[in-house]
């Protein structure tokens, strides 16, 4: 998808805020812990290459979800370790080796496929994934983990780490978290051969369970300044939201009582009023169900009226503003603020999704 550089809708990313967030988190966690910045999904919508370069001196490596995301960083000149958290195709192992990427091995079945590939396994770097209760990928028993590690050793693979992922680290109820942690700790302690790196801490764990950190952490949503729990748990350290989303009025008019706005005529004016149109819609990640939510115009909240279209939306204005007036969809204007979490709460989702859905049509400015 082409970035729409000639349209007045832009996501502004404060790279200094991201750096400050990492500094604050580092002050909150134990020293001498290896730090991975999670920059998957285009750095949660913030721009993977720009973010990775901005924090290069603050982290030891990066986490991405797939091979293509890793290759994007390598092609941009990022030379630190890149850990691919998802499972890659065994047929793509040569690419991973060529670009010195660390891959995740999550099952014996996948390993049997990998063994058939004609590659130099001594150049392959691996972390083993343990499914301690998340239910997605990973080995599920000590026996399976030991067997996997034994085969990897026989193949001459560089076995660098072992890790798991918590399902409820951002929940006030710790029962599931404690169960997963106990399982993972016991498995690691009983391994026949323990890799050098052991990590289980994602953003939430690093904030609220820092006592459980092993010797590496994966920092995701927190470096972008968002609370992993939404508003459920209080943050133990200050964070600043790094992304703001802005557009501008491209059309302003007065409508009369009885006039409708948008597909399905879902909004009908009860009285004469001014309305304005913004060049942003659901193709940009501003979803159709945002009708009734608010944006900021000159520091005042204005309602989104009518259904959000693919490329445009309409807002009710208190007066006739000139074309080109700035409108804030996420961020601060004057004393008022709209956060990604506010948007998520309105949609009935999580702040992660709000940012990740912002499409490539929206240019990022730094």
Swiss-Prot record:
Catalytic activity: L-alanine = D-alanine
One Gene Ontology term, aspect cellular component: cytosol
Coiled coil: none
UniProt keyword Protease present: no
Binding-site positions, substrate: 136, 310
Listed HAMAP family: Ala_racemase (MF_01201)
Family indicated by similarity: Belongs to the alanine racemase family.
Protein name: Alanine racemase
Organism in which the protein naturally occurs: Streptococcus equi subsp. equi (strain 4047)
Gene that encodes the chain: alr
